[in-house]
Curated annotation (Swiss-Prot):
One term of GO molecular function: hydrolase activity
Source organism of this protein record: Bacillus licheniformis (strain ATCC 14580 / DSM 13 / JCM 2505 / CCUG 7422 / NBRC 12200 / NCIMB 9375 / NCTC 10341 / NRRL NRS-1264 / Gibson 46)
Taxonomic lineage of the native organism: Bacteria, Bacillati, Bacillota, Bacilli, Bacillales
Name of protein: UPF0173 metal-dependent hydrolase BLi03080/BL00413
Stored Pfam families: Lactamase_B_2 (PF12706)
Origin: domain of life: Bacteria
Family that this chain belongs to: Belongs to the UPF0173 family.
Keywords: Hydrolase
Length: 228
């Protein structure tokens, strides 16, 4: 299984049999190495409804006939757009053919901005996503501030790899993310959601270096971690 980072909060998981993508914000993402038309994904996992996370979901899903797994209201909204969706909610889990998904809390907002009509569409509650595939557990925290129940998430799950936002302003900054990493007890922690825009400019290497030896891992855009 190969897990790769593609800028902002975009993460792909390739199991060989399945190709999954988290929060496919590609168009408008100056850091990514992906092009929407080249993405192959049979599963799209969304943490919340902000445009910089929903991103190119509709185009990718329609072209690949992808299953979109998302918090309930966001899934309903995307279902109205003609996508194949599986709605979930915080605390709920589901065993799919590609693996198990469970949603956790995230302290953030969730709304999709339709810029042409200047409408903001409520898309439910934001979430973190626990994905268990081939005996490994990946935690994508989505956009979130620090919250104490991260300790519980860490106690209940043996997390092999966690993706944590460090950009500050809209999410946790590096100091809070450092504490989140401690509470989650993940074997490896990769920083995400930084330096896409000036207001979230951060040094990911400084964050990784602040964690215990071997825990912090900066993935350059397009770089991957392989589990065997």
């Amino acid at each position: 299984m190969k897990v790769a980072y593609h800028g902002h909060s975009v993460v792909t998981v390739d199991t060989g049999d399945h190709q999954l993508i988290f929060d496919p914000f590609i168009t408008g993402n100056s850091l990514t190495d992906l092009k929407p038309e080249d993405v192959k994904a049979d599963v799209i996992l969304l943490t919340h409804g902000h445009n910089d996370h929903v991103g190119d979901t509709i185009e990718i899903a329609k072209r690949n006939n992808s299953l979109v797994v998302a918090p309930n209201e966001l899934a309903v909204y995307l279902g109205w757009k003609g996508l194949n969706v599986h709605p979930m909610h915080i605390g709920g889990s589901h065993q799919f053919d590609f693996g198990k998904v469970k949603l956790t809390q995230a302290f953030h907002g969730s709304a999709y901005t339709e810029e042409d009509s200047q409408k903001i569409v409520y898309t439910g509650m934001p979430a973190g996503i626990l994905l268990t595939v081939e005996g490994r557990t990946i935690f994508h925290a989505g956009d979130t501030g620090l919250f104490s129940d991260m300790k519980l998430i860490g106690e209940l799950n043996h997390i092999d790899l966690a993706f944590l936002p460090i950009g500050d302003n809209f999410t946790m900054g590096p100091e809070d993310a450092k504490l989140a990493a401690e509470w989650l007890r993940a074997k490896q922690v990769v920083p995400v959601h930084y330096s896409t825009f000036p207001v979230i400019e951060q040094d990911p290497h400084a964050f990784a270096d602040s964690l215990p030896g071997g825990v912090g891992k900066v993935l350059e855009v397009g770089e991957s971690i392989e589990f065997k």
